[in-house]
């Protein structure tokens, strides 16, 4: 039974940065520190940080006045930022810079009084943060659509002053169809200068497209609440390859592998490589051969840390 590994897979630059912010804050300021929302959507990562003294909360009201708080990689609304400032909380913002880019687009549209459509998944923290960047005081509004059916139902105030942005972790193919529907219904709509779907999401989806057709089954390492991990599973299934989303190696059902000759393995952008290694170990114990790395796009992007948490600043 062959084991084929997708490339790239696993951690992206934004996730690396967010986790490192929490770890360095714990090193510098000591436990406990508070994190608004799970810093990234991965159970293994969150449990490890919790064991180090990170306390994950849903609302700022759960953070004592004298404690440090970190905003998750998914970003927060202007209202949350304003509340933190009003209370004088010490904040480190672990929002992915690519999410911040979308926030800036939304703020620019709202300043210009342009209505804005966000393509994204209802209830996802990134969507809540992005929607919360829009200032309605200039007469515009922001709308959320998930699919083409939502586009058909949508009514806006002024189709001649309309823009769109997207959540960064969506399916590229699904998003392209929604954008086509928007352009068909609102011919004057303007989009971002550069695609909002992040490089890591695109690269990992491309890697699955390259791999899934040659495999009898795909295993996606990632947590159920990880948007980008779910999109990888859906993509493999859309290509006709059975796919399973697993948090850890113990969740692999040997029955999935019965009669299979080639197993593809990938990991969402919030899943650490140690979990992939555990999956490979279990697959080998179940009859798998030595894994083969499938070539893919190399990633070299690194996002800088907040100044106060940089190693040179800490050492001083």
From Swiss-Prot:
Pathway: Isoprenoid biosynthesis; dimethylallyl diphosphate biosynthesis; dimethylallyl diphosphate from (2E)-4-hydroxy-3-methylbutenyl diphosphate: step 1/1; Isoprenoid biosynthesis; isopentenyl diphosphate biosynthesis via DXP pathway; isopentenyl diphosphate from 1-deoxy-D-xylulose 5-phosphate: step 6/6. Belongs to the IspH family. The active site is at residue 126. Its cofactor is [4Fe-4S] cluster. CDD domains: lytB_ispH. Its EC number is 1.17.7.4. Dimethylallyl diphosphate binds at residues 41, 74, 124, 226-228, 270. It is an enzyme of class 1 (oxidoreductase). This is 4-hydroxy-3-methylbut-2-enyl diphosphate reductase. [4Fe-4S] cluster binds at residues 12, 96, 198. It catalyses: isopentenyl diphosphate + 2 oxidized [2Fe-2S]-[ferredoxin] + H2O = (2E)-4-hydroxy-3-methylbut-2-enyl diphosphate + 2 reduced [2Fe-2S]-[ferredoxin] + 2 H(+); dimethylallyl diphosphate + 2 oxidized [2Fe-2S]-[ferredoxin] + H2O = (2E)-4-hydroxy-3-methylbut-2-enyl diphosphate + 2 reduced [2Fe-2S]-[ferredoxin] + 2 H(+). Keywords: 4Fe-4S, Iron, Iron-sulfur, Isoprene biosynthesis, Metal-binding, Oxidoreductase. GO terms for molecular function: 4 iron, 4 sulfur cluster binding; 4-hydroxy-3-methylbut-2-enyl diphosphate reductase activity; metal ion binding. Isopentenyl diphosphate binds at residues 41, 74, 124, 226-228, 270. Catalyzes the conversion of 1-hydroxy-2-methyl-2-(E)-butenyl 4-diphosphate (HMBPP) into a mixture of isopentenyl diphosphate (IPP) and dimethylallyl diphosphate (DMAPP). Acts in the terminal step of the DOXP/MEP pathway for isoprenoid precursor biosynthesis. Binds 1 [4Fe-4S] cluster per subunit. The keyword Manganese does not apply. (2E)-4-hydroxy-3-methylbut-2-enyl diphosphate binds at residues 41, 74, 124, 168, 226-228, 270. The keyword Mitochondrion does not apply. It comes from Marinobacter nauticus (strain ATCC 700491 / DSM 11845 / VT8) (Marinobacter aquaeolei). GO terms for biological process: dimethylallyl diphosphate biosynthetic process; isopentenyl diphosphate biosynthetic process, methylerythritol 4-phosphate pathway; terpenoid biosynthetic process.
């Amino acid at each position: 039974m062959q084991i084929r590994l997708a490339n790239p897979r696993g951690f992206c630059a934004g996730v690396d940065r967010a986790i490192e912010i929490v770890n360095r804050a714990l090193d510098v300021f000591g436990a406990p520190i508070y994190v608004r929302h799970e810093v990234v959507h991965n159970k293994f990562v969150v449990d490890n940080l919790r064991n180090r003294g990170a306390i994950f909360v849903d609302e700022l009201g759960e953070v004592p006045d004298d404690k440090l708080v970190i905003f998750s990689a998914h970003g927060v609304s202007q209202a949350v930022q304003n509340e933190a400032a009003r209370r004088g909380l010490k904040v480190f913002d672990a929002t992915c810079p690519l999410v911040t880019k979308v926030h800036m687009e939304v703020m620019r549209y709202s300043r210009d009084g342009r209505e804005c459509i966000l393509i994204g998944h209802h209830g996802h923290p990134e969507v809540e943060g992005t929607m919360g960047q829009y200032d309605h005081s200039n007469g515009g509004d922001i709308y959320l659509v998930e699919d083409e059916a939502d586009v058909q139902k949508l009514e806006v105030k002024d189709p001649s002053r309309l823009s769109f942005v997207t959540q960064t972790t969506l399916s590229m193919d699904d998003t392209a169809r929604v954008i086509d529907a928007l352009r068909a219904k609102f011919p004057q709509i303007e989009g971002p200068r550069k695609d909002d779907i992040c490089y890591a999401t695109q690269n990992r989806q491309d890697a699955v497209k390259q791999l899934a057709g040659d495999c009898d089954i795909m295993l996606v390492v990632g947590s159920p609440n990880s948007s980008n991990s779910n999109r990888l599973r859906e993509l493999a299934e859309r290509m006709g390859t059975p796919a399973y989303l697993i948090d850890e190696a113990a969740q692999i059902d040997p029955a999935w592998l019965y009669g299979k000759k080639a197993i593809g393995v990938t990991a969402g952008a919030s899943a650490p490589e140690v979990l992939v290694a555990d999956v490979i170990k279990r697959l080998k114990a179940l009859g798998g051969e030595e894994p083969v790395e499938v070539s893919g796009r190399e990633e070299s992007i690194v996002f800088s840390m907040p100044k106060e948490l940089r190693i040179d600043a800490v050492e001083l």
